Amino acid sequence: MKTKRLYCFLFTLGLIFNVACNQLSKEEQEFDALMQKVIDVHDEVMPKMGTMSSLIKDLEPKIDTTATGKSYATAQKDLKDSYDFMMDWMGDFSNKFPHGEENTTKDIEKFTAKMKMLQEEELEVKKLRDQINSSINNAKKLLEKS
C-alpha cells in the first residue's frame, strides 16, 4: 500500500514538474502576443497586393503631361512605393525573425534585443498598413472621377 502511494506521489510530482517546466514565461507570452499582432497586420494588407498591382495598371493609360495626368502619375508612384515597402518589409522581417527560430528568455540579452526589434516592427507594419490603405483609396478616388 505504501509503495502504491509512493508511486502515485512521484507520478503526480513528475507531472507537476513537467507542466511547470513547459510553461512560457510572462515575457515569452508577451513576445508571442506581439508577434501575433504584427502577423495579423501583415495578413490584413497582404491580400491588397493584387489590388495595388491592378490599380497601377489601370492608372498607366491616364498618365500624361496635364495636371490631371500628373495626379494619376503621383497616385501610381504612391502605389508602387507602397508595394515596394511591403516587399522590403517582408524581406527585412524574415531576416530578423527567421521561421522556426525560438525566442526564449534563456539568453535574456538576446531576448530583450529581439523584443525591442519586434516592438519596432509593430510600428513599421502599422505605418505600412496605413500607407497601403491610403495609396489604394487615393487611386480609387482618382479613377472614379474619370
Provide a role label for each language-model segment:
Residues 1-22:
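Sec-dependent bacterial lipoprotein signal peptides
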Residues 2, 31-41, 76-90:
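Short charge-dense sequence patches
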Residues 21-69:
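Immediate post-signal-peptide N-terminus of mature secreted/exported proteins
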Residues 25-28, 32, 73, 119, ...:
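Charge-dense, low-complexity intrinsically disordered segments
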Residues 35-41, 45, 49, 107-146:
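C-terminal amphipathic alpha-helix
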Residues 48-55, 82, 89, 131, ...:
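Amphipathic, well-ordered alpha-helical segments in soluble domains
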Residues 52, 56-67, 93, 97-100, ...:
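Secondary-structure edge/capping motif, primarily at the C-terminal ends of alpha-helices
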Residues 72-124:
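Long, amphipathic, charge-rich alpha-helical segments that form helical bundles/coiled-coils
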